[in-house]
Amino acid sequence: MTQLINVNSRSYRLSSAPTIVICVDGCEQEYINQAIQAGQTPFLAELTGFGTVLTGDCVVPSFTNPNNLSIVTGAPPSVHGICGNFFFDQETQEEVLMNDAKYLRAPTILAEMAKAGQLVAVVTAKDKLRNLLGHQLKGICFSAEKADQVNLEEHGVENILARVGMPVPSVYSADLSEFVFAAGLSLLTNERPDFMYLSTTDYVQHKHAPGTPEANAFYAMMDSYFKRYHEEGAIVAITADHGMNAKTDAIGRPNILFLQDLLDAQYGARRTRVLLPITDPYVVHHGALGSYATVYLRDAVPQRDAIDFLAGIAGVEAVLTRSQACQRFELPEDRIGDLVVLGERLTVLGSAADKHDLSGLTVPLRSHGGVSEQKVPLIFNRKLVGLDSFDRLRNFDIIDLALNHLA
């Protein structure tokens, strides 16, 4: 078996012990802090004695797909190409959903590990990620969302519902993430993969603030699985795709800037196009509202004028040109607009008011997407060495850290 693989200009030492990398969707660090203070997460509370706790930066836009793909490629979106759920294809003049693996421009560490002879398993909460994460992977790969459809030929495993002992969970539930962890435990104790990637959903974090009973219960559930993985002898590495913040005013009303309406009023209809890369089929989570937007300008709209106009709107943190955004956030130039707009910590960006259905938001809006959700945990159940070689820790360094930097 090959002991070293090279993927996207980085080298990875293949692990001799089962290694589990976990992406906890929407894991603002305060969730862990509050759960520890409430006595709900004893394993995480004791981890500093034998493990390592660090903080890193996620990719901006701080959304699920760009960050999960960055983690499994060990590279930013400028390398792998996935910079959101949607981009605007200038040639076809259509908004394109980027859930298909054909938009992925780089190999994954997972697929390369499998080629090197390792047994690799991937379990995701939502099926939208399975196709991307499992690209060219010969191993085990399935989602909790469609666990009832899992079969040996397509997913590399079977009878997963019976093995886990849970029904197929609702996509809008904490159970969807628990299914991921329970499935991971079943795989660890039976097939014992060399490497496992588990990716959850941020349903709980979108609805419940850190320290609330619901949030603490969710983290207590995860903590119990982390402990089980540890007891089974696995190397456990935990990070997040992004953080999470309230996006409301002082009395809980959503703070929304409808950029398309504002731009239409300033420049006229159809002179600009606002694209929200957070948009996905699961709008109950966030109403397709996040703190990152990209804007396409028609010829008649001067870029400098549009930048000044948008930057002058209260709640806008920054407006960047395409080249500035690509340099700062390492994004692919052909998949973002002329401008990138970032909302402040308490503000989300919408397109037009009539394009957003907020009826599913039964609690004060919580979302992500901006720089304000960039700080994420990097937690390991082992001591690490050689960290001086990192100028800046990123969530997509986690596989490198787990495989190459164990003491």
From Swiss-Prot:
Gene3D superfamilies cross-referenced by the UniProt entry: Alkaline Phosphatase, subunit A, Domain 2, Phosphonoacetate Hydrolase
Keywords on record: Hydrolase, Metal-binding, Zinc
Positions with a binding annotation for Zn(2+) 1: 25, 64, 241-242
GO molecular function, one term: phosphonoacetate hydrolase activity
Catalytic activity: phosphonoacetate + H2O = acetate + phosphate + H(+)
Entry EC number(s): 3.11.1.2
CDD domains (UniProt xref): Enpp (cd16018)
Cofactor needs: Zn(2+)
Transmembrane regions: none
Cofactor detail note: Binds 2 Zn(2+) ions per subunit.
Stored InterPro entries: Alkaline_phosphatase_core_sf (IPR017850), Phosphodiest/P_Trfase (IPR002591), Phosphonoacetate_hydro (IPR012710), Phosphonoacetate_hydro_insert (IPR023116)
Protein residues bound to Zn(2+) 2: 202, 206, 368
Single GO biological process annotation from the record: phosphonoacetate metabolic process
Keyword Disulfide bond: no
Positions annotated to bind substrate: 64, 202, 242, 368
Protein purpose: Specifically hydrolyzes phosphonoacetate. Does not have activity on other organophosphonates or acetates.
NCBIfam families cross-referenced by the UniProt entry: hydr_PhnA (TIGR02335)
Assembly with partners or alone: Homodimer.
Protein family per UniProt: Belongs to the alkaline phosphatase family. PhnA subfamily.
Protein name: Phosphonoacetate hydrolase
Source species of the chain: Pseudomonas cedrina
